[in-house]
Amino acid sequence: MDLIKPQQDKYHNCIRCGLCLAVCPTYREYLKETASPRGRVALARKGLEGELELSPNLIEQMYGCFACMECNDICPVGIRPAELVLSMRHVQQQLHPARWKRILFKGLMSKAGWLEAATLPLRLYEKLGIRRLVYLLGMNRLLPGRIRDLEAMLPRLPQRPLRRVLPEATAARGVERYRIGFFLGCAQSLLFGDQSAATLRVLARNGCTVIAPKEIECCGMPARGYGCVDLVENHARHNIAVFEQFNVDAIVTDCATCGSTLKEYGSFLSHDSEWAERAAGFARKVKDISEFLAEIPLLKPAKRIDMKVTYHDPCHLRRGQRVWKEPRRLLSLIDGLELVEMRESDRCCGSAGSQLITHYDTAWKVLGRKLDCILHTEARIVASGCPGCQMQLNTGLRRRGLSARVVHPVALLDEAYGGADGE
């Protein structure tokens, strides 16, 4: 219960003003108090103070939260409902430990090699042409709706995870101006290898020597989302120790979720006297790729991209890191690219980690609103800096029969530089 104590005074301060209701994606879909930040705060308080049993039904309301953090920003008295929800999930894991969580997060996701082995069938599905055959024969239409949508979420998988083929050091082109540590996220390595390879090309082209340690583990966000706080702390200690071996100016990642989590390592380990200072120093160095590139002088891209683009703000970037101007600034560097802002660009797309699996109907309802906003822009490209958002948006667009492509802003910048051919 220790995680709850610092927040106990705050949640008693809830004045039930209802401002959080207007921004909560789950409340907007169901108009139920228990699906709102205000309702979850009340349930947490009553459960922890003994007025209600900490039952599976009560805890399920905490898992219904998409952790988009809009409620944190809008609360006039400083309650942070999204953080309280994560703490309540930890309480549930303490009271009723779930073995599958330990197996998944301590076993499968603790080592990159184990996770890569687990996804081998998916790569074979792509490499052997089975996926192409499934679509050619229309067999995908025979799958149950949920399975069909999950299959459609998968991008075109690389034959090998990027972590396996990426050199630990990528030299700067020309004079080295910066020495950068690169945190390659699990999803980026397994699913979006081409995208992260593009990120490294952009960094190298602009005078950065990039160090990408192969020994890093998961950032810890999946384990945190399911209440396994001790595992998050273990990941943090390991990753900090890995990067301490290298003298880098900054630690950069092109995954919004990873970046948001890495920046919280100082908070996660603030109670640990041995690690608190090291974690705080590590967190200060972490930057999203767009954040870092916006701080350094960049070469002007030579290639034009004559298309309309719109930008979706990932929750873990806009609210988790307060980064939203920088990606747009990068897009503005590309000649011919017309940025058309969508309505509610910073509203959650419904991805939220595993929510498309665990809260399928809600995730699709939230995504529907986002797709309507995208369609209104008539953009041919949707840019976003989060792999989860990219998969969610791509699936929704395909489901509506639309051909707009979903890409990382830095991948577009790399394209304007000439990509791999421009090296």
Language-model features: where?
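Short, intrinsically disordered, charge-biased short linear motifs at domain edges
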Residues: M1-Y11, E51-M62, A171, A204-C208, ...
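Iron-sulfur cluster-binding electron-transfer modules in prokaryotic oxidoreductases
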Residues: P81-E423
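N-terminal glycine-rich anion-binding loops that anchor highly charged ligand groups
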Residues: L19-A22, K32-P37, V210-A212
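Short amphipathic alpha-helical interaction patches enriched in hydrophobic/aromatic residues
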Residues: R28, L48, N72-C75, G266, ...
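Cysteine-centered iron-sulfur cluster-binding motifs in ferredoxin-type domains/subunits
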Residues: D9-Y27, S55, I59-I79, H316, ...
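Non-heme iron-sulfur electron-transfer modules
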Residues: D2-L3, Y27-E60, G78-L104, L402-L412
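Alpha-helix capping and helix-loop boundary segments enriched in small/acidic/polar residues
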Residues: H12, L31-A35, A223-D230
